[in-house]
Amino acid sequence: MTQTLKYASRVFHRVRWAPELGASLGYREYHSARRSLADIPGPSTPSFLAELFCKGGLSRLHELQVQGAAHFGPVWLASFGTVRTVYVAAPALVEELLRQEGPRPERCSFSPWTEHRRCRQRACGLLTAEGEEWQRLRSLLAPLLLRPQAAARYAGTLNNVVCDLVRRLRRQRGRGTGPPALVRDVAGEFYKFGLEGIAAVLLGSRLGCLEAQVPPDTETFIRAVGSVFVSTLLTMAMPHWLRHLVPGPWGRLCRDWDQMFAFAQRHVERREAEAAMRNGGQPEKDLESGAHLTHFLFREELPAQSILGNVTELLLAGVDTVSNTLSWALYELSRHPEVQTALHSEITAALSPGSSAYPSATVLSQLPLLKAVVKEVLRLYPVVPGNSRVPDKDIHVGDYIIPKNTLVTLCHYATSRDPAQFPEPNSFRPARWLGEGPTPHPFASLPFGFGKRSCMGRRLAELELQMALAQILTHFEVQPEPGAAPVRPKTRTVLVPERSINLQFLDR
């Protein structure tokens, strides 16, 4: 009976979206003819380059997705030098493409990050590896990160980090001009929180990011994280030959990654030495100790260079994802006090009567409004506004045949702000995830991706965000800076606030 119901639900799901899929694919007749790349509409190369370099398009790539869909439809083509990119901005077409993926989906193969690894003879981690190496790393890490119970295992560690964040927010209030409860540049504080949290999980040790005096090497790492995304965007936009004439972006990218690798190496070696001392010089055997690095270090098939590459890249991923999403969440909650009040009530109701303990990871994952707030923030401000694929075979996308080895960009920002999927798409409305209004296409908002290339740290990031929001709203009422203008997002490889977000944290 259970299997029958599961099968029926899958069939219902496919039938339900069949009309939209057919419309998006342009199937007017059963024998609709497929068309080639030459038939795909798009901007001329001069106008595309002018948009990127003369009109600030590099920092507005997310907005260009929306403009492209409005001007050319759900599929368009743009050329930059010898590189042709197909842009896909309809949920049904995104689904069609992703469901044609093979066992080892490839992303943009000319990443400057991969080039840095090659130049410095560094091993690639999960973010930069491709092919068999990527598949091996993902198979190794998936049981440690993707399963819900695996993330919940770190709840105690993360709870301690969140408590330190609350204390730091208290200390940071009233510095400089403005109201006494104002904390300036909350994203900067949450960068420290993100690094402390992911390091506690990866290394099983604390870095002191949330102390009154932040260690200098930690500040250097955080600056490198912010800088590397800017230099990545500039480097990818430049032809390779131009680096000799304008060496700045590539030089900064290498410097930033060198600093991050040096930071990770110091802490990996320290962690390895501590583990050896605890075990009398023998490898650490406790694979349930809660530190992912224990799993990395003492599996013979993972070389030391691969351990370092993975730790460095996971530290980077953990910092930016959590810090930006938490900044946007509190920004929107401060501007929508009715949602903040309802969420505070939901969180306090989950506390045990007479208990000062915070809700457990299991309880937090069952709070509907809390989950809806996180989903709505990620819909409005996806950390990665667009994803890329390089198919290893010819694929069909709507009316078109996309040849293998063609770069395809999935426009997640455009689909998540599509008014056909989300009424009032630019409004913060968590209730849309609680049954209010039409149900969007399941591929309309994919902040963590889909399939084999989906975000490995999704469970951990969701838990960290839920715990941080729960504790912050338990202690503080969050209000906007008086007289502050709205903050818009900008592209810096990832989506970030265009300027500092300043918020008031008033004691409850």
UniProtKB/Swiss-Prot annotation:
Activated by cardiolipin and dioleoyl phosphatidylethanolamine (DOPE), phospholipids found in the inner mitochondrial membrane. Inhibited by high substrate concentration. Its main location: mitochondrion. PROSITE patterns: CYTOCHROME_P450. Kidney. Changing R389H: In VDDR1A; complete loss of activity. Changing R335P: In VDDR1A; complete loss of activity. It is found in: Mitochondrion membrane. This is 25-hydroxyvitamin D-1 alpha hydroxylase, mitochondrial. It comes from Homo sapiens (Human). The gene is CYP27B1.
